[in-house]
Amino acid sequence: MSGRVLLGGRDSVPLRGTWAVLHRVTRQSAGPIDSVRTDTAGRYRMQLQRPRAAADSGAVYVVSTWHDSLAYFSLPLNVQGRTAVRVEDLVVYRTTKGTPPIELARRLVTLGLPGADGTREVLEILELQNTGLSTRITDDTLVPTWSGAIPPSAIQFQAGQGDISGEAIKRVGDRVFVLGAIPPGQPKQLTYGYTLPAGGGRFAIPIDQATRDLNLLVEDTVAAVEAPGVESLGVQPVEDRRFAAYRAGPLAPGDRVTIGLPRGPFRPQMLVPYVVGLLGAGMLGALVWALRRKPLASGPATP
């Protein structure tokens, strides 16, 4: 298999002399199996041995490289039945702290009907865009690479999995902190959920930063949604339920977005058929994963 390692910037250039490492991942084990340094053109070539056992035939292979304190990985490689495998270019970046700015490109908020105890589950999926030419990092848990506001009344916060690992997401007061690296390129998704206590009459979504697009999925089709330039996308029947979809944006810090809180049970899995058309494949994978997560355990509220 062969590929290139490039140093990203205004013009990507070959990265000479860096290690390209081939990894094999099976159900039983995972680890590097070969490595080579790139040449003057940033190219590398490695020989992949044919599987020695039936268990190895289901192995997944990836190529990684390391630059400026960060590891970069290729997508999983399809090697079955192929004599040559071309790996996508691995583009690495220098790292910086505090810059470049991270934009909130898209925010999806899903609000369900109250459960038997009156609480309501909220799921959010966000897309963050690094607008610069370097990967933003942090080494201080009090200085996140990005942060955003959530309702002060939210309890039982739980980070999900996306492009940004749930382990790199935490709640600090009324904010969500991202501590993971955010490289340039395609927007990176993060997912989290929380519970709204019973008794609230309206759900206010805090807008603390510029947001290009805001999508809302509300299970109550007659809920009063208020937002600057809000657009109704209609009501979609899904089995025995109906969901109202809305779009707003671009939004400025301080813009007011509120939703009247309905009543009734919420089965989030029913959202999936509609979301296919509304969001497309990009956000759908994250939404499906998040909605299939185990329900939040009942217990004391977390700050």
Model-derived features: positions:
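Lumenal/extracellular ectodomains and adaptor appendage modules
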Residues: 1-303
